[in-house]
Amino acid sequence: MLAVECAMRAYAERLGQDVESWGVAGLIHDFDYERYPNDAQAADQEHPAEGVRHLRTLGWPEEILEAVLGHAHYTGVPRVSLMAKALFAVDELTGLITACALVKPSKAVADVDVAGVRKKMKDKAFARGVNRDDVIQGAEALGISLDEHIGIVLAAMQANAQSLGLSGLSPGGHASEIPGGGTAPSTGTSPDA
């Protein structure tokens, strides 16, 4: 979720939008996922609808709520606002970029480039949980090329590598420390980066 926040902030700056509200949308878009994980067999998915229902009772801005609902196809909520389009566009891509970094010997997002992400996109066995069609459709929805989209999100993640735990291995071969405690993961990917 932190990677999605970083990417959303980058797009907000680029598009002249409110950086804080866009960042918050990225940060909270999956806040209810652990409580309501997606079940491929279920006809009615609770994530993100249950979380949005709760936030609505607390008076959260409708633009953020609509973006959160729109990032999941199965909600049927159209992505009308730029915020909603951007959230959909960056969600899967941040997971793919995270996976690309974690398979590097250095475990550093600084060692990932656009060409490498494009190459890994073609490998369906790599980061299987990442929906490549969503990545492509997201760039199209924003009216930019796929390479430009990857470049924007990658640059945002590289600029925030330390807080994302993607700054690489320390000289001793250990995962880098994340500010506030803990270490960066050395293998695997999160469900949503």
Q: How would you name each of these model-derived features?
A:
Residues M1, M83-A86, G143:
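Conserved phosphate/pyrophosphate-binding and hydrolysis machinery centered on Walker-type P-loop NTPases
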Residues M1-W22:
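Alpha-helical phosphate/pyrophosphate-handling elements in metalloenzyme active cores
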Residues C6-Y11, S145-Q162:
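Active-site hotspot residues in diverse enzymes, especially metal/ion-binding acidic/histidine motifs
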Residues L15-K124, I136:
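Divalent metal-dependent catalytic cores for phosphoryl transfer on phosphate-bearing substrates
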Residues A125-H149, L164-S167:
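C-terminal binding/interaction regions
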Residues G182-A193:
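Long, low-complexity, intrinsically disordered segments
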